[in-house]
Structures are given as structure tokens and as C-alpha cells.
Amino acid sequence: MIIELAKNYGFCFGVKRAIKKAEQIKDAATIGPLIHNNEEISRLQKNFNVKTLENIKSLSNETKAIIRTHGITKQDLEELRKKDIEIFDATCPFVTKPQQICEQMSKEGYEIVIFGDENHPEVKGVKSYVNTKAYVVLDKKELQNIKLPSKIAVVSQTTKKPEHFMEIVNFLMLKAKEVRVFNTICDATFKNQDAIKELSLKSDVMVVVGGKNSANTKQLFLIAKTNCEDSYLIETEEELKKEWFLDKKHCGISAGASTPDWIIQKVIAKIENFGIN
């Protein structure tokens, strides 16, 4: 059986940057998980004493706080700045961009449409920078019964599929006099999604490695599943089952943006150890 890695996969720029910061800073607390990968979070805590707190209220004797890659709300940032604590911002620049856009556009009188998951920490943070009105949607149908203003700015969660974002944009173009469109989808998302689409079309089994609470990993899995019925989403090599690979000729592997290479290599090694010819 051939085992093939996607052309683009794994750690993105923003995650690499955040991990490096955390390793250098040490002995700190992150407000929410730094990234969406439990294994890497555990490694940071064990080796660098970087612990994860649920929220700002959980801070007690910590002297250093790291802002997660997904960012935090404007209100939480203001509260954090009032505390006697050193702040290190590991927010991905691709996430900071829609925050800045929303703040500026709402100052100019635009209402904001955010294409994304309202419960995702990134979207919560972006929405908090809107000073007018914000509509968070996952489907254009959610906009049909809303009385939309004449001036709209639209942004996307960084990990969403571009074609779905364009469905929202096309709908808004027919409804509002002025629509400002900002492409806030991360280019790593484009590359990883294109790569897994290509690989899944020629594979008869796919393994996607990443946190099951990771939005970009779930998107990769959905693309794989669309093209390859026998697709599996796992966090570690412990979840692999030999029967998945019996009678298979081509195994494709991809990984979410928060998945470190050391986990991916463990997955590959275990599949090889199954001895499927």
C-alpha cells in the first residue's frame, strides 16, 4: 500500500509563530487553548510550564499571559491590560486582520456580516470589534429574513471554504447598495484544502490528523470524505485501526494547521507497522 502525504498540510505560519513564542516565554498561562491540539498543549505544559486557563477570571498568581492564536475579545483584552501581568500576543496576524477591518468599517458606518461559526473563539473575537451591528452566519438562508442595511462589509472566519464565502457575498450583492468584501480566509487554508482535495480523489483511504475541535481540521475531513468514502479523522496514532487499510492500495494523509510533525510521523509509522502490502 502506498502512503502519501498531501502537498500542503500541518502547522501553519500562525501556529508555528505561537508555539515558538510559548517555548521562548515559558512559565506562562494562555487564555483558552493556545491552539486546537490537545497533544501539543500537553507537551507545552509538560516541557515549558505553559498552562491553559479557561478565561481571564482564572488568573491568580501568574506573571505572564499569552493570548491564543484565535485571539480574544476586545473586552477581555481591555480587562487583561488592567491586571498586573505581562502580556504576550500570539494572535495569528490573519486573525488580527478581520478584527481591524471590522473595527474600521463599523466606524465608517457599515454593518458587518461575518461568515463563520458564532461559537468559535476567533469569530467571538472578531465580532467584539464591531461598533455597529454584526450578523454571524454560516449560510445565506440565515440572511433572508433580515432587513439588511444599505452599507455592508463582509469578512470570513479564516478557515472557511472560499466557495461558501462567495455564496454569502453573491447573496449580499443582490440585497445591498454597497457591499465591501474582504478576503480574510488564510492562504494556508486555501493550500491545505486544495491539496487534500487532490489527494483524496486518488486515494481509497484517507486519514486526517488533528484536533477534533479544530475548525480547519474538520473542513479538511469534510473535503476528504466527499471524495473518499473511507476517510477517518484522528487526533493520535492510538485511534488507528488495521482493518481500515485492508485491501487498500493508496492511503492519503493530511493534517490540520495545529498538528505538529511529531504526531504525523507517529501516525505514518503505525500505519507502516500494520504491514499492509
Curated annotation (Swiss-Prot):
Biological pathway: Isoprenoid biosynthesis; dimethylallyl diphosphate biosynthesis; dimethylallyl diphosphate from (2E)-4-hydroxy-3-methylbutenyl diphosphate: step 1/1; Isoprenoid biosynthesis; isopentenyl diphosphate biosynthesis via DXP pathway; isopentenyl diphosphate from 1-deoxy-D-xylulose 5-phosphate: step 6/6
Enzyme class: oxidoreductase
Keyword set includes Iron: yes
Keyword Iron-sulfur annotated: yes
Organism of this sequence: Campylobacter jejuni subsp. doylei (strain ATCC BAA-1458 / RM4099 / 269.97)
Protein name (Swiss-Prot/TrEMBL): 4-hydroxy-3-methylbut-2-enyl diphosphate reductase
Residues that coordinate or bind (2E)-4-hydroxy-3-methylbut-2-enyl diphosphate: H36, H70, H120, T158, S214, N216, S258
Record-listed isopentenyl diphosphate binding positions: H36, H70, H120, S214, N216, S258
Cofactor: [4Fe-4S] cluster
InterPro entries reported for this sequence: LytB/IspH
Gene3D superfamilies in alphabetical order: 3.40.50.11270, 4-hydroxy-3-methylbut-2-enyl diphosphate reductase, catalytic domain
Highest taxon in the source lineage: Bacteria
Catalytic activity from the UniProt record: isopentenyl diphosphate + 2 oxidized [2Fe-2S]-[ferredoxin] + H2O = (2E)-4-hydroxy-3-methylbut-2-enyl diphosphate + 2 reduced [2Fe-2S]-[ferredoxin] + 2 H(+); dimethylallyl diphosphate + 2 oxidized [2Fe-2S]-[ferredoxin] + H2O = (2E)-4-hydroxy-3-methylbut-2-enyl diphosphate + 2 reduced [2Fe-2S]-[ferredoxin] + 2 H(+)
